[in-house]
């Protein structure tokens, strides 16, 4: 049943009481010897093949991490974990709710709600990310900087999904490998802030932390953290994912349709000639497949796999949606398939790392030029002590010049520790500037330069560029300057709709996909020529 933001919350409550289940020990994640609260085990769907539920591990024993890494990480990984053990650690970036009793009641209500995603889907994503770590797949992760209640409608969801489909088709053809499509959608509300308060004209109010916490209007009522927003965020996330599932499996994602969209883009792009050749080759490939008997109405050509992700920031909410999976005996945060820890909350002894080390979802780590290589090795050891491929994705956000200087040291440290990770470029956050009009923006040329640096470094180091992570939208906004359909500083205010950071619009996103696809193609052809020598 599709969820609606207009539904009453009582209609979402389960009809039967939750049943306490024994907590199962497992080899790969921390366990707890006592039940903290009643947990209803969630059986994984999409996992009828039991072999698909087997965690991927490295094919041969990895090299032991450096002694300093082992000593620092072992103390954390040996500690008993429970779904609320994070409360014993220092938690940064959490809002202060004035009404704690109301917060407690809201969290209890969400605990009783159904999961938004399923454990089997998260396991399947981990397998796919393991392929990306080995250079056999490519991650495309994109969506809003921060989802909002005001802009929640089917058209916006459809447009972002559509552009991700178009980008995925281009990247898949360029790299001749599967593209893992993950949306920053269906839960990407909360945002970390550098300051707890914002001051305007002598008035000081709490900072806006995302629509699931407070409102962006600068008044006391809007800025006061409201627990009821968590329930609305849950309902919007569930409704968004419901629509995404329908789009992914109902024919909207048909490859022939996506290819025609890309051909239309090249016809109307100022640099269309540059991209038309690739788009035409995709169209010809579909014609060949049709002639060979793999018709375009085959299920593999009309459906796609799609996963959701968001930053793991609001720990009380994440805990409320954590469930014990009856298939594996592992805990999964069922708010999203993939969660990442941000630059501001990745402290080794912090609450966010403590929570994430105990859930079985695939995890991301945002890494800037401030990250020390040895600290990264320690963090990976805490979050992935069994060295499972696909468990950890490193999302680098540095700016082009810092990327060339800092990334090689991180790659060498991780490789030296024998750790398996998927390397991904976030070319957005390291390239934010302030326009003359005062609005934040990101130059497309700087974004492109960071992606180029990412590929250059991996080529230099002999490692695998595993994907890109983008803040983007399917709407025709004017938030990032540049691109073939040039957006100038003067254009910014005309369609500047973001609630937080500037996003690539549909045209800029697809243009970047064509650029990356060409780089993937050159890398593939280079590898083939080396093998042919």
Swiss-Prot record:
Phenotype of null mutants: Reduced floral volatile benzenoids and phenylpropanoids (FVBP) emission.
Cell location: Plastid, Chloroplast
Cofactor note: Binds 1 divalent metal cation per subunit that could be manganese.
Any GO CC annotation of this UniProt entry: chloroplast
Tissue: Mostly expressed in flowers, especially in petal limbs and tubes, and, to a lower extent, in roots, stems, stigmas, anthers, leaves and sepals.
Pathway membership: Metabolic intermediate biosynthesis; chorismate biosynthesis; chorismate from D-erythrose 4-phosphate and phosphoenolpyruvate: step 1/7
SUPFAM superfamilies: Aldolase (SSF51569)
Biased composition annotated in UniProt, kind: Low complexity: 57-70
Biological process terms in GO annotation: amino acid biosynthetic process; aromatic amino acid family biosynthetic process; chorismate biosynthetic process; green leaf volatile biosynthetic process
Source taxon at top rank: Eukaryota
Region of interest: Disordered: 47-70
Catalysed reaction, written as an equation: D-erythrose 4-phosphate + phosphoenolpyruvate + H2O = 7-phospho-2-dehydro-3-deoxy-D-arabino-heptonate + phosphate
NCBIfam families (UniProt xref): DAHP_synth_II (TIGR01358)
Quaternary structure and interacting proteins, as annotated: Homodimer.
Entry similarity comment: Belongs to the class-II DAHP synthase family.
Name this polypeptide is given: Phospho-2-dehydro-3-deoxyheptonate aldolase 1, chloroplastic
